[in-house]
Structures are given as C-alpha cells and as structure tokens.
Amino acid sequence: MALYRTARRPLQMMLFSRLGNPEQNYSSWARKDASQSAFGMFVRLFSAHAPAAAEQMSLIKQLRERTSAPIKDVKASLVDCNWDIEAAQKDLRKRGKVLASKKSGRAATEGLLALAQNEGKAALIELNCETDFVARNDIFQCLALSLAKQALLTENTAQQASGIHPVGPECLEDLMINLEHPKISGETTVQNAITEVAAMMGENVKLRRGFVMSTSLPGVLSTYLHTSPQPGLGRIAGLLSLEIEDGNSQLDVLHHVGSELAMHVVAAKPLFLTKELVSSDALESEREILKSQAESTGKSQMAIEKMVEGRLRKYYEEVVLMEQKFIINDAVNVKTVLNNLSKEVGSPVKIGSFFRMEVGEGIQRLEATSADEPVAQAA
C-alpha cells in the first residue's frame, strides 16, 4: 500500500504542475463559461432583430432595384436602419444629396442634348455628366427628356417673338417636374430631380443651358439630332426655321427640305446666315490674315487686293449658310436650294433662323471662342 501511494504521488504532482491549483483552475473555468454564455446571449438577442441571410439578400435586391444605388451603400443604409427598407430608402437619399454636393465641383463634359417640340416651337437643353456610361443610362435620359419638355412649357415675353431665346438653369431649377420612370417617379423640383439622379449615378450631373426657338406662322421648324440613342436625344443638334408667305403652300415639302437643311447645319457648321450678317470683327480678322498671307508672295499691291477678295469669297463659302455647298447635293449652294423650293411651292421661302449646339463645347477651355459656343443666327 505504501508503495502504491509513493508511485501515485509523482503522477499527481505532474498533473498539478500542468493544470495548476485545482481550486484556482475551477474558478477560471467558471469565469470563462460565464463570459461565453453572456456572448452567446448577445448573439442570440442580435440575431432575433436581424433578418435571416436570405431575407437580407432580398431586401438588398429590392432597395437596389428601387434606387440603383451601389450595393455597399444599400447594405449600409439597411443595417443603419435596422433593415427597414422604407427608412433605408430615405437614408440613401440623404447620403446621395451629400455625395452629389461633394461631386458638384467636378468637370462634367459628357452628356446629352434633349429636344422637345410642338407646332412652331422647339426647346433644346444640355444635361451634362462625367462619363458617356452615365449618358447611356435610361434614368439620365429620362431626366434629360423631362427637362426639355419643361423648357418647352416655359413662357416669357421674349419667346413670343420669332428667333432663338435662352432658357438658363435659373429659369427651370425651381419649377416642378414629374419624372415618368419606375426608379425615380413622382413630382419634385427640377433641382431636386437633378440632385437625386446625380446621387444614383455617382457622378456630377448638371443642367448646363437651354434654348427655345420659335417661328411665326406660316412656316415650319425643322430639327436634326446626330448620334441619337433614342428619339429626342443626341450629342449634336441642328435647328432651322423656314418661313413662307403663303400659308396654303405645300408644308410637307417644306418639312422635307427643312430636315435636310437642319442636317446640313450639323455637318457644315455655319457661323452666319448671310454675308451681310458676318460680324465686322470676324471679317476684319479674316481680312488681316488673308492680307498677310498674300503679301508673303511679293506681288504688287493690286494683285494682293485681288487675292484677298478672292479668298474672302472662299471664306464666305465656309462660314455663311446661304453660301455653303449643300451637303445633299454639292452642285448647288443653300441659296439655290431655297430658290428652287420657292418655285416648287409657288411662294417665297426664306430661312428665319438657325441654331447648332454640341455637347460639351467650350467646357474644358478657359476662354470660350465663337467656335466653343452654340451657333445661332436669325435674319
């Protein structure tokens, strides 16, 4: 028996050395077990308030479809709002307005022109964004078309006269607009709609400018949009009004020729309607350039003057609409096209005004020149 006790003592000492004092060890186990129980209770309580993983994914998908916001923002708003989808949608709008405000200083050189038109009147606006990816988005395009329709509805004393009249952002931003899109529907102000779309797209979205063209009846107003993703949208626009003395003339013929002339305006980029309307500054500048070029030939003064006059005629053919070669048939100029049209309809036809605008022109330059701004001129 004594031998047995003696043999057992080293084994006990080895166990004690590894486990420590049994009483102390029991106390540490109790504390550890209690802490694990408390953590387990916390996890169970938290899990009782958060939906299951499948339901979470469903809520994220629903809110993503409603708002088109990035998934990480959608999930963050849902978590912050205890997975209440309505509250999360409001939270996303607040986040979006802050984000849109931060991005408002970034250059927005892409975008679209949107056109709305009725009898004798057309409105053209430019809505900018940062990338052509956003310009292709259907929400962005819906906003652009809605803004053009709103611009068409504006009325002021200046617009009652024929010609081209500016409709700047300040004229539109406080007006109410109804966006007919499932992800951004409802009535709100123009400025709020732009801010909300900017938040959804994650880019700076800006209404840059707008114009209204009107014509007195009888007459037609023709338009052409280049690089058009859908009717009413494009990157380059040409507008042109044809006026006729006899209101009973063949208006369908006028519409056809007017559409071709609007296309011509986009392609040929005229700066002036007639030679008489060429600005004195532009003419003097061109004359000085041509004279300097002619003098370098070393010819007589009389020969130099003839060279300058000949080259001025070429200049008129480049920048004056009535003198330009018609893009549909370059055997004739635009003036001849109008003369032939007048004979066909049996009444004099003239161009009342024309207008050309392109997305992003002049934005990236510090000083805009005549080539950087929309070209418009009336007779």
From Swiss-Prot:
Subcellular location: Mitochondrion
InterPro entries the UniProt entry points to: EF-Ts_dimer_sf (IPR036402), Transl_elong_EFTs/EF1B (IPR001816), Transl_elong_EFTs/EF1B_dimer (IPR014039), Transl_elong_Ts_CS (IPR018101), UBA-like_sf (IPR009060)
UniProt record, GO biological process: mitochondrial translational elongation
Xref: SUPFAM superfamilies: Elongation factor Ts (EF-Ts), dimerisation domain, UBA-like
GO CC, any one term: mitochondrion
GO function terms (MF aspect): translation elongation factor activity
Coiled coil: none
PANTHER family: ELONGATION FACTOR TS (PTHR11741), ELONGATION FACTOR TS, MITOCHONDRIAL (PTHR11741:SF0)
Protein name: Elongation factor Ts, mitochondrial
Chain's gene name: EFTS
